[in-house]
């Protein structure tokens, strides 16, 4: 191991204590750092361990991006983005027809929309098949794979 591989996780865990965080929310890729902080609490007999909330990492919006990046604003949706900015980023997002793997639009639907709302509605003209209401992500994914649902209908929804 390099010095950085040893020191950097310790620095990340130290942030949790320096900030006096009761709850620490990080992506699943940071789970080991969170567990290191909790194990350190055991070692020093600290009674109040930080509560760890881990969540899935969202893909970047461009093709081939495993996760969003703050250094590439077009690859991520930020809390301060306007509705127009979000709509433009989703419109430009990588979303190949019928492909589920590495598809950020479907990833967002699965981990944000369905996790929070439980359903999703696609409004389209009668000529294009009319309104579709999805009660579950697997139902939407099946329609996407078989071509019933096209990216051009999915993205503006």
Label every PLM stretch briefly:
Residues 14-28, 38:
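A long, hydrophobic alpha-helical segment
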């Amino acid at each position: 191991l390099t010095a950085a591989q040893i020191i950097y996780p310790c620095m990340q865990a130290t942030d949790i204590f320096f900030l006096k965080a009761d709850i620490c929310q990080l992506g699943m890729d940071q789970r080991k750092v969170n567990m290191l902080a909790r194990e350190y609490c055991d070692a020093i007999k600290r009674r109040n361990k930080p509560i760890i909330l881990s969540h899935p990492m969202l893909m970047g919006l461009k093709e081939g991006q495993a996760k969003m990046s703050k250094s590439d604003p077009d690859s991520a949706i930020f809390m301060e983005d306007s509705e127009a900015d979000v709509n433009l980023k989703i419109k430009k997002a990588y979303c190949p027809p019928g492909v589920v793997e590495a598809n950020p639009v479907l990833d967002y639907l699965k981990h944000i929309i369905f996790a929070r709302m439980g359903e999703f509605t696609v409004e389209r003209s009668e000529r294009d098949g009319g309104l579709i209401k999805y009660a579950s992500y697997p139902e939407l994914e099946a329609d996407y794979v078989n071509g019933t649902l096209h990216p051009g209908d999915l993205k503006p929804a």
